[in-house]
Regions:
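Class I S-adenosyl-L-methionine
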Residues: 1-136
Length: 136
């Protein structure tokens, strides 16, 4: 990644008792990963690429991976730096109770539009946790 100012790696969190887990995902301009399992393979259809609306935006796939590995449906998530809302989209998809804060009105409004566009496309197929429990 010598040609850009972006880091090759970002450490999200660690402690003294657990090992570091690496999430590999291509995220450089128009070169974006295909999926969680194939994050190192460039997505062929550029129309499926995420549009960046925030300078430190992370891919939704990163939060999908985090939530799949470290949460259960119905868990509560607090994001104090909401930014582009990628975590909110992934939390919605994972059935999490999500609260987010963003200090910038501009970025808050951008992520709100992004979230509304996402949910308007998926609401027909999305069940929230209480609806899932009703069907059990």
């Amino acid at each position: 990644n010598q040609a850009t100012s972006f880091s090759d790696c970002e450490l999200a969190a660690t402690d003294l008792f657990t090992t570091v887990r690496l999430f590999r995902y291509m995220w450089s301009g128009m070169m974006q990963g295909k999926s969680i399992k194939e994050g190192h393979i460039m997505q062929g259809n550029k129309k499926l690429n995420e549009v960046r609306i925030h300078p430190t935006q992370k891919p939704v796939a990163l939060y999908d991976w985090i939530f799949q590995n470290y949460t259960s449906p119905g868990d509560r998530v607090l994001d104090t730096h909401l930014g582009s809302g990628s975590s909110r989209i992934a939390g919605y998809s994972a059935g999490l109770e999500f609260t987010g804060f963003e200090i910038s009105a501009e970025y808050y409004n951008r992520q709100e539009r992004r979230f509304q566009e996402y949910t308007s496309q998926t609401d027909m197929f999305h069940l929230n946790l209480s609806e899932v429990k009703q069907h059990e």
